[in-house]
A protein has these predicted regions:
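Conserved PLP-enzyme active-site core in the AAT-like
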Residues: 1-191
Length: 191
C-alpha cells in the first residue's frame, strides 16, 4: 500500500484502489491514462484470492498489462502467468529467501504482452534516444520489457543485488518447496 499510495506519487504515478473481487469496479476504474492493472495473488493482510483470469481478461481488453505481486503466493503455490499475468513481481526477501537475511526482488516477464499495440508504452515501443535509438519492442521482441528494465532502469538507478545476496536468495530457493509445504500443512491445521 505504501509503495502505491505514498512512494510512487513522488514520481507522478497515481493509483486507483478498487475491490479486486468486484470485476465491474476493476473495469470502471480504468482511465485513458491507466498504464497497468496491478494486484496481489494473495492480498495482504486478508489473504484474499482474486480471480486472476477474469482480471487479466479485463486488463487485456483495454490493452493493459496485468502485473501480479506473487510475494505471498510464491512460485510454489501459484504461477500467475498461467492465469494471464504479463509481469510477476516478488519480494524475494520473504518466502523466496526465507531467512530474512537479504533484501531483493524479482521481476518475471511472460513475454506475451504486445507493448506496441496500445500506443501507451513509447519508452518500450518507440526508438529510445538514450539507448542509441533502439526500440526495445522491435529489438527484443517478447523480452522487450525485461530488456528495457535491464538496459535503462538498472543502468540509471543502480538497482542491483550484490553477488553474496544473490547467493543467499538462491540458497533460499533450495528449500522453498519444503518451507511452503510446512506453511500449508500448518495453515490446514489452524483452519
Amino acid at each position: 500500500y505504501n509503495l502505491l499510495e505514498h512512494t510512487l506519487t513522488q514520481f507522478g504515478v497515481t493509483t486507483t484502489f478498487v475491490n479486486a473481487h468486484d470485476l465491474a469496479e476493476v473495469e470502471n476504474a480504468i482511465q485513458p491514462n491507466t498504464k497497468a492493472v496491478y494486484l496481489e495473488t494473495l492480498g495482504n493482510p486478508n489473504s484474499d484470492i482474486p480471480d486472476i483470469d477474469a482480471i487479466a481478461a479485463i486488463a487485456h481488453k483495454h490493452g493493459l498489462p496485468l502485473v501480479i505481486d506473487n510475494t505471498f503466493g510464491t512460485p510454489y503455490l501459484i504461477r500467475p502467468i498461467e492465469h494471464g499475468a504479463d509481469i510477476v513481481v516478488h519480494s524475494a526477501t520473504k518466502f523466496i529467501g526465507g531467512h530474512g537475511t537479504t533484501l531483493g526482488g524479482i521481476i518475471v516477464d511472460s513475454g506475451k504482452f504486445d507493448w506496441k499495440a496500445s500506443g501507451k508504452f513509447g519508452n518500450i515501443a518507440d526508438p529510445n534516444p538514450s539507448y542509441h535509438g533502439v526500440s526495445f519492442a522491435d529489438a527484443a521482441g517478447p523480452a522487450a520489457f525485461v530488456t528495457y528494465i535491464r538496459a535503462i532502469l538498472l543502468r540509471d538507478t543502480g538497482a542491483t543485488i550484490s553477488p553474496f545476496n544473490a547467493f543467499l536468495l538462491l540458497q533460499g530457493t533450495e528449500t522453498l518447496s519444503l518451507r511452503i509445504e510446512r506453511h500449508v500443512e500448518n495453515t490446514k491445521k489452524v483452519v
